[in-house]
Amino acid sequence: MCPVIMGTDKHHELGVGVSAIWSPMCDRFGIDSPIFGFAHDIETVAAITNAGGFGVYGATRRFPEEITQELAQIRSLVGNRPFGVDLVLPPGMPEHNSREAIQAEIPQEHTEFVQQLVERFEVPKASKPGMRTRFIRSKEIEQAQLRAVMESDVDMLACGIGAPADVVAQAKDRGKTTLALIGSPHHVPKAVAAGVEIIVAQGYDAGAHTGPIGTYSLVPQIVDAAGDIPVLAAGGVATGRHIAAALAMGAQGVWLGTAWLLSKEHQGDMHRVNRDKLIQAGSADTVITRSESGKPFRQVRTGWSQAWEAEGAPAPLKMPYQDVLVGDLLGAIEEHDIEPLIHSGAGQSIAYFNDVKPVAQIMQALIDETAQALHTQQQFLRL
């Protein structure tokens, strides 16, 4: 079980003399709180780190030269404080970055369905490639992205949908901590064999790519299976009560993504329609669909997910074919403000976030609430 130490602060408003939470993750990385935050924009990542957590930059959709530049930008914003980068490294991707080769294998039924959506919602053509078709997810681009990461001074490499042993070894040789996000206890032996140093147990509640097992059921199983490898809990973590529960289940910290979607720092990358939909969304307003990328992906339910769930819709293709099929359309939807189809990845914890706040304020609330929850739990002990 991960020890948690609570500090004191005369200005604390809880009335319990507590203002800090601690786990071995804090000493390992020199952070103030064991809260790891994932985001797709550099301002939010830097703000998480500067607020005493550990920011992680989602760079899967970035060109290698962009990764180099953006990691340097984050470093300039955080100084010597630690931060990480996340890449999705799924097995079975094509060798080369060839759009034509992928398009040639897409069934006509799927192409016609996408065209029907274009006509039904009167979507003009995109003026530039969409986020999912700027390049084709392939081993070629993956290797170039990894070179950019390895040549940077980023402190951690987080691997999603696979953590290849050779990549883990290379990162460790470069002095970078390695982390794998997994959604099933069955994935633990492979992660351990690959040599990862931290495991994120990501439950079904989580936004974006996620697995089939609920966080409450998943975390203790992965903690038990991981042995001495520390585990972070992810999926549905939105308040200090969730963090306290994660620590009680044996996690040494938490990994949050949805919590930052409505942060002030993130709004530069947030479409106004997405922001409004996220503010209004409850836990039941999210849905898991393969229509986004070909992998299970939790997002806010909109006309997009409903169209792919409708009778007569084709089954989404596997990654990266679904990316190529829908990528340009998804880009056009946001570019031209097609409101019924605009959507965002988000976890079930979105119900807890209904206005825009600075990252530092979100972080402090999480710390205060965790301390309060841990203090309150002591009443259930009879010594």
Would you name each region that the model predicts?
Residues 103-113, 212, 217-232, 238-383:
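Conserved active-site-proximal phosphate/metal-binding subdomains
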